[in-house]
Amino acid sequence: MTLVDLSITPIQLVQAYGLVNVAYLPQGATADFDARSANLLSSVGLPHSEVFTSREDVEDPYPADLDPTTLGSRFDHYGMPCPAESRSWRMLGYLFTSLVAVDPASGRVYAFPEGSAGYIALHRDVESLVYALVEFRKLEVDHDNDVDPEELSRRFKQVVGAFDPVPFAHEDSQWNLSLEELEHGMW
């Protein structure tokens, strides 16, 4: 599979997170995904960090007959209600405390905030999610180098918002909440 017209490359992701912090999905695991998402997940991958956790906890094994990446079976396993339209969506990981899932048919990415029974649109597609995570990693590095938090927040919103306005459309988006914490010195 070739990387056709993707705005993020495997090299950019590895440079931002390091090779050991990139998780790739096997092509077979993405067979029911839209072609663009399947290509990105198997060729570019997802980062794994404190901000975005893309790997399962090996200390929390699941029964052999459970698919923990499909939201319906995952939510059922934990005794949580799962909105009917999202039962076939696939879990990608956690962004801070929000479970992040993709609708494999459309490629749209949604967040299930902790303590909420519903979900909100997070990104127009998986490419936008990975793009935002790479930009957020740059923000983290600059924050560690004492760049002004308000400048970092403004720049992140400008760069990511120009690529995809969805991450900032909902006031309770995990991106908006984390940038608010950054601006208020809670990091």
Predicted regions and their residues:
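Membrane topogenic helices and adjacent juxtamembrane segments
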Residues: M1-D5, V109, V141, L152-S153
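Surface loops and adjacent helix of pleckstrin homology
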Residues: P104-A105, E114
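Hydrophobic residues embedded in beta-strands of well-ordered beta-sheets
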Residues: L99-V100, G107-Y110
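Compact, glycine/acidic-enriched structural inserts
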Residues: Y110-V147
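Hydrophobic alpha-helical interaction segments
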Residues: D142-F163
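Short alpha-helical interface elements
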Residues: T53, Y62-L66, A117, V134, ...
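A surface-exposed partner-binding patch
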Residues: M1-A101, A162-W187
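Charged, low-complexity, helix-prone segments enriched in Lys/Glu/Asp/Gln
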Residues: Y78-P81, E85, A132-V141, F156
